[in-house]
Amino acid sequence: MWKHVSQVLADQFGAYYSIKHKEKIHTGEMHEAWIIDDGIQPVFLKVNDKTFRSMFRAEADQLLLLAKTNTINVPNVYTVGCSHTHSFLLLEALPLDKTNPVDAMGKFGEQLAKLHLIKGADNYGLDFDTWLGPEYQPNGWKENWATFFSEQRIGWQLQICREKNLVFGDIEVLVKKVAELLAKHKPQPALLHGNLWIENCATVKQEIFTYDPACYWGDRECDLAFSELFEPFPRQFYESYDRTYPIDEGYPERKAIYQLYYLLNFSHRFNKHYVELTKKFIHDILSR
């Protein structure tokens, strides 16, 4: 694999590129991650077996899609490659600082609002499917937001949970309830990061960069809801966002519904206390 990576990098940066140093920095839920360099140009490498090529291709396409908006900062994409045994994604290696200063987060709120203000779709979905963490995320286009979110987000995650022997009651009942609660809400489709929480943000030279997206065109409130779920962003982020693109007064009523999608995902991935929290959210939603 390393020989193939070296050849791809030589094609990308010029024949002079030769890997002189490599350091494994993370073996996460799915992929290995490395920093490799030739002494001049460091590169971030995600690697897995060759069956993951489509996942890496989707991640690259999402980062390119976000980069084209000239709003939020994302790593540059170099290429997606595949050897006989492995697939990999090569990205810009950034000196990430996880402190995320308040001033930088305030500016990030404005940048995210500008992303959400872009009009590029009439319906909800994306031209290709993506992943939320290790789980497939279907993005088939729908004209109706309530149908899209209830079926392709809540219903989909509930089905994955059930396949992993994690049952949260009758799937059809909850999907119907979510559709009912969202029935009158017809948001302008916004391009979403889709996986926006503090773990996917870091600072580079006083600018917030974000990564690991799960993009689609949907309700902008989904990004805001996940950002508030576990470790909310600083107050300045939301104030800056609201100044640039005022938050709808009905958002508090929908926030828990959108957060449920991520809680279901975390429940079947990590279990632990997420299951009990998810049960509480479901109970509260069904009680409305």
Swiss-Prot record:
InterPro entries, alphabetized: Fructo-/Ketosamine-3-kinase, Kinase-like_dom_sf
GO molecular function: ATP binding; kinase activity
Binding-site positions, ATP: E92, A93, L94
EC numbers, comma separated: 2.7.1.-
Sorted UniProt keywords: ATP-binding, Kinase, Nucleotide-binding, Transferase
Keyword check for Acetylation: no
Alphabetical list of Pfam families matching this protein: Fructosamin_kin (PF03881)
Positions of transmembrane segments: none
Family as reported in the entry's similarity comment: Belongs to the fructosamine kinase family.
Described function: Ketoamine kinase that phosphorylates ketoamines on the third carbon of the sugar moiety to generate ketoamine 3-phosphate.
Protein name according to UniProt: Probable ketoamine kinase PM0587
Source organism per UniProt: Pasteurella multocida (strain Pm70)
Organism placement in taxonomy: Bacteria, Pseudomonadati, Pseudomonadota, Gammaproteobacteria, Pasteurellales
